[in-house]
Amino acid sequence: RIGRRPNFNEPSSGEIVDQPNETTILSAAKVLGQTESGIKYGIINAVTGQEYGTREFESNGITKKDRFLIEPYSNYFVGRFTKPIVNDLSTVGFMATDLHRSGQNVKASSFKGDWLLNLMENRLEFTGEYATTINEENGYAGRLRLSYRDPSFWEIATWAGFSDNKWNVNAMGFQQKNNNWYSGARLSLRRDKPKGIFLNQNLSIRLWLSGLHNGMITRNNLELDFENNFTNYWNFGIKAEINPETYVDDDIYRDSRAFIIKDEAWRALNIWFATDRTKKYILRPYYKLNVGDGIANNSRGDQTELGLRLTLKPTNTVTFSVNSSIEDRPGFMQWVDVVESDAGRFSDSDGKYDIVYAKTKRRQINTKLRMNIAF
């Protein structure tokens, strides 16, 4: 976020018609180190300059322009340290960020404490963090994860997290949706040693739940993933998903007047195989099917995707890949816009408006090219 497009001040009248695409960084410093006791620390501090834009406004029926201060002088600070505990692979840590803008009494700080415990010869791992953001109001968030990996053939993991409606890291980071919670669990079974026609096999079952603090469930996903590696170095995989009805709150982050909508139950299947990975070329075709159950005779319809990835390895250091797919993705309740109208169905202090959603049908061909060169 340091040096991003200036956007702090907005004019109370008129509009900005021209402005810089980035903020000038006047100075920056980074300090990294480690003490004899094993404490690792890092500090970043940067100062950015003033940035002006051109404001266009009306005065007595005449269009005028002037310089407008969009971004004042600002100081960015990030500090982090970790300390080993119990063993060399377990740590506790602390992190702080602060943004101060010249001439502005606006708080923008955050603090985080975290831990990582690796026990029982790294088979058991427990990690988590708890953080607060200090802006106009204080927000809080936290998460944790506990896992155990058996040396022979299985692994289990569980995780959970939350954020309240005042959690906001947008000043120094990238804000994700707040005011929600999530939890999940995964069981994995594996065969690491060759047996019969298989080099190894992996089976995982994962359950993921998330929702809002008012009780609405926004994700309810059960997933099964099965992958097989054969002795001829071919691969085959299948992935299946079951998703009961949930609610979708994405649109309220576009516009607070939008709806939280109900999404239909759906099921998905993904089948793929790949040819010998030791050859100079590898083919990986796949097929995806997504079947919806519909809500009150509204259904997005079956979604399909057919694709092929071709990987070429002319040398040991150069790899080309071409990934092409054909998608057919119908949908319903797709957000369009909020339209102000004197005859609008809804109203607030600014007047009447309509909220527009639409059914969609997307058919497209995607092709991605990639080249990797190793030195």
Regions found by a protein language model. Name each.
Residues N21, E51-Y76, T82, H100-N105, ...:
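Primarily recognizes Gram-negative and organellar outer-membrane beta-barrels
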Residues F77-K83, N87-L99, G103-T127, P314, ...:
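Transmembrane beta-barrel wall of Gram-negative outer-membrane proteins
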Residues R1-H100, T158, W181, R267-L269, ...:
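Active-site cores of enzymes that catalyze phosphoryl transfer or operate on phosphate-rich substrates
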Residues T24-L26, L32, E121, E125-F375:
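Exposed, low-structure sequence patches enriched in small/polar residues
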